[in-house]
UniProtKB/Swiss-Prot annotation:
Inhibits host immune defense by binding to host chemokines. Binds host CC chemokines (beta chemokines) such as RANTES with high affinity, but not CXC or C chemokines (alpha and gamma chemokines). Residues 62-87 are annotated as: Disordered. Residues 1-17 form the signal peptide. This is Chemokine-binding protein. The keyword Secreted applies. SUPFAM superfamilies: Soluble secreted chemokine inhibitor, VCCI. Induction: Expressed in the early phase of the viral replicative cycle.
């Protein structure tokens, strides 16, 4: 369930979801019960006018996976088990363009590509899975597992100001994107919470889309969207097909 709270210099909100691309059919399996699920997260940030300009993108990317529960649980016979363990959450911290963007993914498709662009007060980022045949393949899962992933995937976002001065660390390879179609699909609550420091962030728009990267299937594709513009919040209205100019993005990983 989406919710938001506006604080002094912070906006706490729930978020939303967007879209991706289309995979090499030659790499995809025709097996009916195999699905290669992907995720595509697109972020558009407009910084406050007084914020210093910083066009250094991809200054650093950090990935950490952790679980909130202790995996060792005492049983009645004094032995230990691994039951009741919360699913791990993978966090990505991206520093660039005068911002630190932190993303948390729980029970979601794997992120394999991270890219960023900056021009003046505009900072854009994209995190996505990668289609088959790109050397970073996601594992195939069953239809039941894919439906559960759509239902359970949760994304959190935390965007803060950054004064990092290190140089950009842009990768030379092209930006890899997922292969999810851009057709109209139903909305799903995928975002947990979004924290935005309004000291440096004026507007925020982002979208998320989850879908099969090999097969177009309406019941295996969902999206969500969120806007925070001039102090007003809108949910589920972001057009992920035109949110940013993807040709300007540079690979961070």
């Amino acid at each position: 369930m989406k919710q938001y709270i506006v604080l002094a210099c912070m906006c706490l909100a729930a978020a939303a979801m967007p879209a991706s691309l289309q995979q090499s059919s030659s790499s995809c399996t025709e097996e009916e019960n195999k699905h290669y699920m992907g995720i595509d997260v697109i972020i558009k940030v407009t910084k406050q006018d007084q914020t210093p300009t910083n066009d250094k993108i991809c200054q650093s990317v950090t990935e950490i996976t952790e679980s909130e529960s202790d995996p060792e649980v005492e049983s009645e016979d004094d032995s230990t088990s691994v039951e009741d363990v919360d699913p791990p959450t993978t966090y990505y911290s991206i520093i660039g363009g005068g911002l630190r963007m932190n993303f948390g993914f729980t029970k979601c498709p794997q992120i394999k590509s991270i890219s960023e662009s900056a021009n003046g007060n505009a900072v854009n980022a994209r995190l996505s899975s990668v289609p088959l045949g790109q050397g970073k393949d996601s594992p195939a899962i069953t239809r039941a597992e894919a439906l559960a992933m759509i239902k359970d995937c949760e994304l959190s976002i935390d965007i803060r100001c950054s004064e990092e001065e290190k140089d950009s660390d842009i990768q030379t390879h092209p930006v890899l994107e997922s292969n999810i179609s851009h057709k109209k699909v139903s909305y799903e609550d995928i975002i947990g919470s979004t924290i935005v420091d309004t000291k440096c962030v004026k507007n925020l728009e982002f979208s998320v889309r989850i879908g099969d990267m090999c097969k177009e299937s309406s019941d295996l594709e969902v999206k969500d969207g969120f806007k925070y513009v001039d102090g007003s919040v809108s949910e589920g209205v972001t057009d992920d097909t035109s949110l940013i100019d993807s040709t300007k993005l540079k690979s961070c990983v």
